Design a protein with these regions (language model features):
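Hydrophobic, aromatic-lined core segments that form the binding pocket/scaffold
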Residues: 2-175
Length: 175
């Protein structure tokens, strides 16, 4: 199963979990993970726009983000980079998802992972054949530029909660 498919399942499952948590239903057992409808959305520009609005330390990274956003308008993602992106998202699970237990906000954490995947996967696709060192540099760069600021995390979470563009269905449509 591709990483994109796994992320779709994570979104759908965690949306159901989030709804149960919000309704204070704590008996979360044996829910299927493959129930979702994929409607084509295709346009990921709002994800790139959100990233451009963050507190970014490096102008070079912002230029790369602009180029990747332009590339994403006319291209689709493949599964060529699933292995390194899976490793990066494993880091996100350990860093963010497991701490979501305290905040009772699991869906924003998954949306953060999906957005990180979309931005970094398109950047890797844009570079066509990056070396392993370049792949690592891109993933580390995303982490450094986005995660360095508490305000960035707050802005991302607010968008994930209140902006309908970041709905689960919309993100599944992009994946």
């Amino acid at each position: 199963m591709s990483l994109s498919e796994r992320l779709c399942r994570l979104l759908a499952f965690n949306e159901r979990v989030q709804n149960m948590l919000d309704d204070e239903i704590f008996d979360i057992t044996a829910m299927p993970t493959d129930e979702y409808k994929k409607q084509s959305c295709g346009d990921a520009s709002f994800i790139f726009d959100l990233h451009k609005s963050l507190d970014i330390m490096s102008k070079d990274w912002l230029c790369e983000l602009e180029a990747t956003a332009d590339f994403a308008k006319n291209n689709t993602l493949s599964n060529r980079f699933d292995k390194p992106l899976t490793a990066y998202l494993d880091y996100c699970v350990r860093r963010y998802y497991l701490s979501a237990i305290d905040s009772f906000n699991v869906i924003s954490t998954i949306k953060r992972m999906v957005c990180a995947y979309i931005v970094t996967a398109y950047e890797l696709e844009r570079l066509e054949n990056p070396t392993q060192a370049k792949v690592v540099k891109i993933l580390q760069g995303y982490s450094k530029e986005v995660e360095h600021s508490y305000e960035n995390g707050e802005l991302l979470e607010d968008e994930f909660i209140f902006n309908p563009l970041f709905s689960t269905d919309n993100l599944i449509g992009i994946l």
